[in-house]
């Protein structure tokens, strides 16, 4: 098969994979699943992971304050740093009220994202961000509980990148899912939305 045809097939495969990922994101963004009446979707749940300081933390450590949750990885070239920058802007806008909320960065790349790697990465963002990692099994479990999907994608030049759900989750003070948190608005509007849940 000619190299040009191989490249075309690879591009089509990547496009198809992207459609699957987008479909999953759209399904989550449509809102909670319901059977027989309104209810809060079963998104989120217990976890036991390691933070950027090497300390074991659980979902209970984040109770009592609403939080934003996002899945990503430190080698992410665009979506992750952009999202974390926008989340950082929201916390800066909150001023003294920033201590009444939290944000969690769940890695989808525990192979490379050790606590020191995450700590260095998050040093560029707001200190209210907690970066969490763990064993591949632990990460798979928490991703499943949030209905987040991710997969390793080999790169032609060697190494790999990660495809992953790019939703920001708004969770309430009890760790229950509220809604996907849109960043496609001004940081002031996003701040006002988070402030409603403090």
What is the role of each PLM region?
Residues 60-87:
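Short active-site neighborhood of thiol/selenol oxidoreductases, capturing the structured segment around
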Residues 42-44, 66, 163-165:
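Short, small/polar residue-rich loop motifs at catalytic or cofactor-binding pockets
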Residues 68-69, 103, 168:
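Hydrophobic beta-strand anchors of alpha/beta hydrolase catalytic cores
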Residues 197-198:
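Short, hydrophobic alpha-helical segments
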Residues 1-46, 50:
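N-terminal targeting signals for export/organelle localization
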Residues 47-67, 91-94:
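A short beta-strand-turn-helix
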Residues 82-142:
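Structural microenvironment flanking redox-active thiols in thiol-disulfide oxidoreductases
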Residues 138-193:
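Thiol/disulfide oxidoreductase modules built on the thioredoxin-like
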